[in-house]
Amino acid sequence: MPTHQSLGGSTDEQLLQRMVASHRERFGEAYWAFFAARVAPRLPSPSVVIDLGCGPALLLQDLAQRHPAATLYGYDVTPAMIAHGRQLSYPGATPTLTVLDVSVQPLPHASGTVNLVSMASVLHVIDEPLPVLAEIRRVLAPGGIFLLNDWIRQPLQRYLAWRRDVMGERAPQDLRRGFRLFPVHSKYTTEDWQWLLGEAGFSIRDEVQLRDAHRIFVATVTGPG
């Protein structure tokens, strides 16, 4: 699959450091309030949880703090991300972290055994999302949740202003990276995501926009899983 590094002209280490630095902006109080209200009540205890495209595993660390009884798995295509996650401390059991490209490799889970699959700012990078969505659908247990958190289309001026003002990217090379990433991050509209989820056999139970140009969808399998 394409990577954020190849698309944005960054090294693995540069992307890792940006993800670590921006984690609280991406997964702050508003995110966890939404999670507690709209996602957590649907989960059994204990739960089996996958973060697909887990990056430096900070979201898994957050989940471990809030749901210490959960069995956590993280998958990412970049070895440096997995290595970072393995160095973190976690309440309860340490997540199983594995290098895996879900666009070409199946998830190592039996069908119908996972309660939550989270995918944050990753699916838009994958050229053919429907096979990946089918694999997520396969592993979800009855009543399981797919939590999709991804970019939605926005005007170029607003996108570049966000990179400058929120991400602090002000150098000439930052602007060049912004122009390279704009078509990737503005690939899908909200309606496109809604259609993709429906086409893949999911029903949207809830959705919210907590950050500019990002939308969260809480989806479950439609009909037999």
Where are these regions (language model features)?
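Conserved class I S-adenosyl-L-methionine
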Residues: 1-45, 58-62
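Short glycine-centered segments of the SAM/dcSAM-binding site in methyltransferase folds
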Residues: 48, 144-145
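Class I SAM-dependent methyltransferase SAM/SAH-binding core
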Residues: 50, 56-105
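Short conserved loop adjoining the S-adenosyl-L-methionine
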Residues: 106-111
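A conserved beta-strand element that flanks and buttresses the S-adenosyl-L-methionine
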Residues: 118
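Short catalytic micro-motifs in class I SAM-dependent methyltransferases
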Residues: 121-122
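A short glycine-rich, Lys/Arg-flanked "PGG" loop and its adjoining helix->strand segment in the class I
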Residues: 130-142
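C-terminal alpha-helical "lid/dimerization" subdomain adjacent to the S-adenosyl-L-methionine
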Residues: 149-200, 205-208, 213
